[in-house]
């Protein structure tokens, strides 16, 4: 009994459990040097990133988990209609790490990936014979492709919409993925 008494009366400060965070992230000096490096003349590191959610206990689906040495990241999928978590993740990496981000998709024709959904959903009620006819009409793509002025105007409208999308989401550019053997 005499030997067990110290167990019950000593070490009172150890009986209360509390979470302790011992992680100290990189310093502002580190990030300033990283941003300066990324602005310098050096071989650029580029990569693609998919399955982006910008949230979770693991950084596997966050831009913040990309190695600091990567200069430019092309977002493959999940680049549109981004969540608040994705916005914060993107802004952190752009502003703090100095990483640049591009949206990326395969271009099979004018309008790919950014034609408004209501065109796809309502083409029949809009009086078109096919979905593609409705898409072509929206972008001004002529049925007679020898009409160079109309083709150029359609391409310019599409390019302008891509630029607007880049600005809308705060990306740094667009990775044109044209694969002639696709589709």
Place the predicted regions along the sequence by residue:
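Chitinase-like catalytic core of GlcNAc-active glycosidases
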Residues: 41-183
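Bacterial Sec-dependent N-terminal signal peptides
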Residues: 1-40
């Amino acid at each position: 009994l005499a030997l067990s008494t110290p167990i019950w009366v000593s070490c009172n400060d150890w009986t209360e459990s509390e979470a302790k965070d011992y992680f100290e992230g990189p310093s502002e000096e580190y990030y300033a040097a990283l941003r300066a490096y990324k602005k310098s003349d050096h071989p650029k590191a580029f990569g693609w990133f998919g399955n982006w959610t910008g949230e979770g206990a693991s950084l596997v689906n966050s831009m913040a988990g990309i190695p600091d040495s990567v200069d430019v990241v092309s977002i493959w999928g999940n680049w549109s209609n981004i969540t608040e978590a994705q916005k914060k993740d993107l802004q952190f990496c752009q502003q703090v790490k100095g990483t640049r981000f591009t949206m990326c998709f395969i271009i099979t024709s004018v309008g790919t990936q950014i034609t408004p959904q209501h065109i796809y959903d309502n083409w029949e009620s809009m009086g078109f014979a096919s979905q593609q006819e409705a898409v072509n009409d929206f972008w001004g793509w002529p049925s007679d492709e020898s009409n160079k002025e109309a083709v150029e105007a359609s391409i310019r409208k599409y390019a302008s919409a891509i630029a607007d999308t880049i600005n809308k989401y705060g990306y740094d550019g667009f990775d044109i993925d044209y694969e002639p053997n696709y589709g």
